[in-house]
């Protein structure tokens, strides 16, 4: 293997590692944003007695990065199917009960998403370290084989 191909391979390993680390961080950020969204919905129901249409209009103005509102309210695919399904269940149930029921429902989903977030945040550091170490090891192997 010549030096040019080994450098190209090393750069590819670096880019793969960086891409994976960015995806892990996006997952954690999206989960945090979901908790923020659900908390905002709860506060708007509790203090402003907003209906579904008002909740959506207000949420659209809050500048979420991982939550979209058109054609329907969804969360980014970076969170995985299980979390995305839970988020869609929450969105579908907003406005289906009285105010107390909605507040209890919001509390339940806030706790669920805090659990998802805490799990993701606790694993994030170790995953990032492992992926970084593997990327460095692959880069070193590529350079040794090419040199």
Residue ranges and their predicted role:
Residues 1-70:
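Juxtamembrane/interface alpha-helical elements of multi-pass membrane proteins
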Residues 7-16, 121-147:
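Bilayer-spanning, highly hydrophobic alpha-helical transmembrane segments
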Residues 22, 26-29, 33, 79, ...:
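Non-transmembrane, amphipathic alpha-helical segments
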Residues 25-26, 42, 82-84, 93, ...:
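Context-gated lysine
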Residues 35-38, 42, 60, 88, ...:
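Generic structural concept
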Residues 52-55, 83, 102, 109:
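Amphipathic alpha-helical interface surfaces
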Residues 71-100:
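Short, non-transmembrane cytosolic segments of multipass membrane proteins
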Residues 96-138:
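Membrane-interface, cytosolic juxtamembrane amphipathic helix immediately N-terminal to a transmembrane helix
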């Amino acid at each position: 293997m010549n030096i040019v191909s080994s450098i190209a391979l090393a750069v590819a390993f670096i880019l793969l590692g960086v891409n994976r680390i960015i995806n892990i961080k996006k997952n954690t950020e999206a989960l945090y944003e979901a908790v923020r969204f659900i908390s905002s919905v709860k506060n708007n129901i509790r203090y402003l007695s907003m209906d579904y249409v008002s909740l959506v209009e207000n949420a659209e103005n809050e500048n979420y990065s991982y939550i979209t509102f058109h054609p329907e309210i969804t969360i980014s695919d970076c969170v995985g199917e299980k979390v995305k399904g839970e988020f869609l269940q929450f969105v579908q149930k907003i406005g289906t009960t009285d105010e107390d029921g909605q507040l209890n429902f919001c509390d339940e989903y806030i706790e669920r998403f805090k659990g998802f977030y805490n799990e993701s945040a606790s694993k994030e550091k170790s995953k990032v370290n492992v992926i970084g170490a593997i990327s460095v090891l692959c880069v070193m192997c590529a350079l040794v084989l090419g040199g």
